[in-house]
Amino acid sequence: VLSAADKTNVKSAWDKLGGHGAEYGAEALGRMFLSFPTTKTYPFHFDLSHGSAQPQGHGKKVAEALATAAGHLDDLPGALSALSDLHAHKLRVDPVNFKLLSHCLLVTLAAHMPAEFTPAVHASLDKFLASVSTVLTSKYR
């Protein structure tokens, strides 16, 4: 459960991304695909070469979904219900991939925002991403 301080940290960090959300989302996906090769089986025939439009486009979708989540911290299940259905029933993404992507996103944010990425912000973002992952995997059965 996110505390009031966690919610403040998440909203503040997300606000500081500015227009870089899609870029950081794509970078995090690239990190995940390179660091965890088994994740490459899920983005159905993505061209994973550097600068490819497919990971860039999916990175934008990831960033937009996380921005939606950051704006609805008190109702993550409601805000992410359609996305949870999509990943569980249509895409059938391995639930482990959400944890791996969360890790890669934390690394990406730390690399681009070192001054803002304090231990408290790190902990809050980690809890936030874990909560998002839990919601996205809630309809897997």
Swiss-Prot record:
The modification Phosphothreonine is found at residues 8, 108, 134, 137. Heme b binds at residue 87. The keyword Iron applies. GO terms for biological process: hydrogen peroxide catabolic process. The keyword Aminoacyl-tRNA synthetase does not apply. Keywords: Acetylation, Heme, Iron, Metal-binding, Oxygen transport, Phosphoprotein, Transport. The modification Phosphotyrosine is found at residue 24. The modification N6-succinyllysine is found at residues 7, 11, 16, 40. Residues 1-141 form the Globin domain. GO terms for molecular function: haptoglobin binding; heme binding; iron ion binding; organic acid binding; oxygen binding; oxygen carrier activity; peroxidase activity. O2 binds at residue 58. Heterotetramer of two alpha chains and two beta chains. Belongs to the globin family. Involved in oxygen transport from the lung to the various peripheral tissues. This is Hemoglobin subunit alpha. The lineage of its organism: Eukaryota, Metazoa, Chordata, Craniata, Vertebrata.
